[in-house]
């Protein structure tokens, strides 16, 4: 039975929550902020302090506690810096332009321990030539320490590609690698541009979703027919939402809800509505009810695109470093596409051709090949294949990453022990965990008899394949670079971004 005290406590809580919400409403703060773990900690600490808490002043928020948070973030940053010299570092870079056409370039450092935000540069007044991009990247490498950096990952734009070549010419022991997520997204873009069936079908899919989502009544009807499922793929379980993968994810969701959509447009509700009389409504109905043209084309598009979406999700995952997997996963994606089209060559050969053009010219890199060779997940499989490209990639990595010729010879000799599963490599636990442990952890456990090879392998297999971590959390920059904050001194602005971005990265671990 509810007591009087419980009734009063509920009312007190409602009053407190109402005041918290009023603060959020009057400052136009996103409702989603209540899901931030820091929000829960704040509420708990206020409750623990009890009556009489004096709120922080404007000066304390702007000066005192910001400085403390910068120091706290720097301490966290130092923990990551220790990891830089132990394993492999990837410098990740990406650019962003806000609504006012201000350009920001940011730089992150990734290791197996996690990713940290290092710096951002306002490039609005800088011509982004290959030379300038090279100079910015070179300065960042100097800050991190060339001896700690294995690769620099950026997007595939021509100026970044040329800057990467300049970088590898100056810094003889590291690699420039194009972002795998960006490469795969460009493959999907090529599908849409070069394959008429894809272009037309995607456009029709967009028309359907735009039409329904811009009409509240239709959206309400659709919810009844699809029983609470989502029409647009935007849930965390879905693959990465890149610019061009979104189009195929939308087609996938339309396909999942094909029956519900057809039922809705065949229903009495639709037939008796005002929408059916308008030209747009008639046009959308024609598309949805086209079971011989539109829907088979949707299925065909997905047969070609979804295997690549799987690779996209893998390389963008924070779960494990993807370097040891992308080489084989791209081959598996092509095999899956072939299987989806029942091995009929004329049905998939143009898709394969588009993939190969990007893969061979942009994504196929020495690090990818070396990591494939060194990955125990694949190396001992009956399907493992070592062609000339894989061997060239492996030995190119050895030449660049291991400057001492004597050490390279040692590693080359130790590779034979790995290939033949001799010593620790062949014990039962090593065999049983080849596909269960991450490649880096496996080498850490069983590579002690080959110390030089072990260090080399862990550095390669612990690498990320993408700079997509850079593309997240641009909202941190959006929030700082606004009218309301334009009186902040540049250093405070930098401090605020440094704290916000690294806290957001920490949340994701």
What is each residue range found by the language model?
Residues 1-509:
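Short alpha-helical patches at protein termini and domain edges
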């Amino acid at each position: 039975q509810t007591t009087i005290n419980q009734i009063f406590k509920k009312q007190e809580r409602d009053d407190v929550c109402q005041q918290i919400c009023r603060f959020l409403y009057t400052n136009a703060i996103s409702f989603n902020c209540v899901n931030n773990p820091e929000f829960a900690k704040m509420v708990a600490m206020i409750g623990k302090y009890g009556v009489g808490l004096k709120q922080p002043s404007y000066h304390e928020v702007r000066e005192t506690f910001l400085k403390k948070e910068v120091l706290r973030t720097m301490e966290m940053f130092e923990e990551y810096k220790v990891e830089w010299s132990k394993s492999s570092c990837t410098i990740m870079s990406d650019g962003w332009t806000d609504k006012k056409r201000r350009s920001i370039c940011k730089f992150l450092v990734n290791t197996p321990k996690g990713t940290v935000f290092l710096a951002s540069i306002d490039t609005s007044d800088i011509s982004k030539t290959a030379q300038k991009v090279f100079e910015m990247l070179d300065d960042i490498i100097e800050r991190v320490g060339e001896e700690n950096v294995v690769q620099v990952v950026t997007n595939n734009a021509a100026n970044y590609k040329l800057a990467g070549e300049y970088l590898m010419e100056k810094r003889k022991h590291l690699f420039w690698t194009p972002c795998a997520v960006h490469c795969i997204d460009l493959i999907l873009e090529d599908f849409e541009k070069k394959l008429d069936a894809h272009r037309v079908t995607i456009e029709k899919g967009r028309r359907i979703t735009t039409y329904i989502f811009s009409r509240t009544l239709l959206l309400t009807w659709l919810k009844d027919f699809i029983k609470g499922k989502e029409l647009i793929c935007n849930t965390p379980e879905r693959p990465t939402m890149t610019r061009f993968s979104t189009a195929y994810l939308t087609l996938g969701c339309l396909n999942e809800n094909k029956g519900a959509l057809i039922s809705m447009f065949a229903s009495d509700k639709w037939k008796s509505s005002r929408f059916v009389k308008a030209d747009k409504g008639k046009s959308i109905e024609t598309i949805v009810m086209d079971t011989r043209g539109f829907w088979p084309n949707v299925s065909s598009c997905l047969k070609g695109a979804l295997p690549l979406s799987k690779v996209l999700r893998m390389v963008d995952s924070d779960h494990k470093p993807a370097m040891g997997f992308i080489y084989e996963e791209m081959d598996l994606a092509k095999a899956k596409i072939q299987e989806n089209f029942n091995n009929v060559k004329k049905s998939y050969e143009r898709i394969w051709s588009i993939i190969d053009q990007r893969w061979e010219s942009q994504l196929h890199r020495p690090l990818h090949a070396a990591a494939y060779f060194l990955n125990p997940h694949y190396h001992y499989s009956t399907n493992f294949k070592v062609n000339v490209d894989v061997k060239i990639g492996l030995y190119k990595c050895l030449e660049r990453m291991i400057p001492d010729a004597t050490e390279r010879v040692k590693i080359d000799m130790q590779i034979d022990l790995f290939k033949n599963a001799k010593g620790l490599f062949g014990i039962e636990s090593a065999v049983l965990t080849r596909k269960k442990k991450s490649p880096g952890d496996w080498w850490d456990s069983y590579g002690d008899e080959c110390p030089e090879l072990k260090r080399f392998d862990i550095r390669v297999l612990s690498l990320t394949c993408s700079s997509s971590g850079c593309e997240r959390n641009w909202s941190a920059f959006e929030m700082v670079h606004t009218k309301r904050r334009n009186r902040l001194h540049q250093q405070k602005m930098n401090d605020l971004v440094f704290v916000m971005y690294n806290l957001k990265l920490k949340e994701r671990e």
